[in-house]
Amino acid sequence: MKVAGVITEYNPFHNGHKYQLEQIKRQTSADYIVVVMSGDFVQRGEPAIIDKYERTRMALLSGADLVLELPSVFATASAEFFAGGGVSVLKNTGVVDMLCYGVESVDHELTKLVAGVLKNPPSEYSASLARLIQGGMSFPAARSRALCEYFRDTYDSASEKLDAFIASPNNILAIEYEKALMDCDITGFPIQRVGEGYHSTDSTSEFSSATAVRGVISTLIDIDKHNTITNMQLDNSWISTKFSQLIPSACADILVNCILGGHIVFPDDISEMLYYRLLTGKDKGFAQYADCTKELSAKIVKNIYKYEGFTQFCNLLKSKNLTYTRISRVLTHILLGIENNDFNICMNNPYLRILGFKKSSGELMHLLKKRASVPIITKVADAPYELISKDIFAADLYGRLCHSQQNEFTHGVVII
């Protein structure tokens, strides 16, 4: 039996994701696909647009066989910890043979070459990185420049194509995946992406990005009026037509129900909750939270009374050496109570949280129970609370945002 793994967000699931799952089956001859998916908050440091159970349903209807939750500590982290956490989950299943990931251009050798440098940084690279950061560059920009400088001096052939290669968010994740895979027996398998880029807002393509799909959703919602439909005369068929070229039909039905039911969540929906957290924590500061330096903590406190909302505050705080995404992650960590030591705690106390599976994956589920090296959680009530307390808290906050009547203790595993 051959099992492929995928680490993803599906925020939301779209045609490009379905294409990837189809290509995994076709190119690897995998019998099953195990998906490790972010829960209710995602790597950009924002709430997911629809909840994790509906996104799980989308994945299972479109080619996935088993969906596991990526703990919120890793799901909201930088690419390094996002990838490392995801690989750790796949490794702990004991059943996954390969990790398949999307790339803008398939160059597996270059990916592994760069991953090796990041895994064991040469002194030349480290010196360049430190110099560039001290010069005011953000960490992502400094890392890219330092890598280009290092490869230009050591591998001329690699340096020529490195600039374009590391400019893509998907390729950066691919590098981090390969870096994490160096510590386990799972092999990497790159899949060529099709369609629009990660940040593209073009919603006319068959393979539009998740960013573009979220943009279309936002045109149907009056965000300032608590997620009410902008035109109450809209019906299911009209909205379905809006998404017919963007996402698989089964997923479109799920998304339409979420829209009409008022279960869509946008980044600024966390604004009031976050402001409360900032006000109650300003005297102590925020340096204990993941990714937050003392300098950024001081900047947050200094500007707290200029706060108007989540995205406005992110834009207010960003600078040449602090990206919007870095700040949004920090603010989300403050909201969720994710502190610096939580990464180690989570790595040292791993678990497998099953969000959903197919009835037809009985062989896979049997093997998982036999080979998993960590606890398998299907019922939150049966799990040690301290093990998944961060995920429960994140889900409780999200449930308030999306007007859900269920919680982690009452919502069952999704079975298709």
From Swiss-Prot:
EC number: 6.3.4.-
Record-linked InterPro entries: Cyt_trans-like, Rossmann-like_a/b/a_fold, tRNA(Met)_cyd_acetate_ligase
Residues that hold ATP according to the record: 7-20, 102, 170, 193
A GO biological process held by the record: tRNA modification
HAMAP family from the UniProt entry: TmcAL
Sequence similarity: Belongs to the TmcAL family.
Official protein name in the record: tRNA(Met) cytidine acetate ligase
Species assigned in the record: Agathobacter rectalis (strain ATCC 33656 / DSM 3377 / JCM 17463 / KCTC 5835 / VPI 0990) (Eubacterium rectale)
Gene name, Swiss-Prot/TrEMBL: tmcAL
